[in-house]
From Swiss-Prot:
The lineage of its organism: Bacteria, Bacillati, Bacillota, Bacilli, Bacillales. It comes from the Bacteria. One of its GO terms (cellular component) is cytoplasm. A probable RNA chaperone. Forms a complex with KhpB which binds to cellular RNA and controls its expression. Plays a role in peptidoglycan (PG) homeostasis and cell length regulation. PANTHER family: RNA-BINDING PROTEIN KHPA (PTHR34654:SF1), UPF0109 PROTEIN SCO5592 (PTHR34654). This is RNA-binding protein KhpA. Pfam families: KH_KhpA-B. It comes from Bacillus subtilis (strain 168). It is found in: Cytoplasm. Gene3D superfamilies: 3.30.300.20. Keywords: Cell shape, Cell wall biogenesis/degradation, Chaperone, Cytoplasm, RNA-binding.
Amino acid sequence: MTDQHLEDLIVHIVTPLVDHPDDIRVIREETDQKIALRLSVHKSDTGKVIGKQGRTAKAIRTAVFAAGVQSSKKVQFEIFD
């Protein structure tokens, strides 16, 4: 799965969870050893993306890591507001 596919996967997962889908941003920072994906959503949607006790965020992170396992680089995923 390519880097762009990882970004598309995140957007596809997060879009139904938020009230402001136009404010979804996935920022990719890539080095020789890792791909860092940072998700930004509207301030009022942050809690929805994180979920109770972080369960939703953990599920998103698990899906992203599973999709990125074919990459030779380590995949890092963060949510920020």
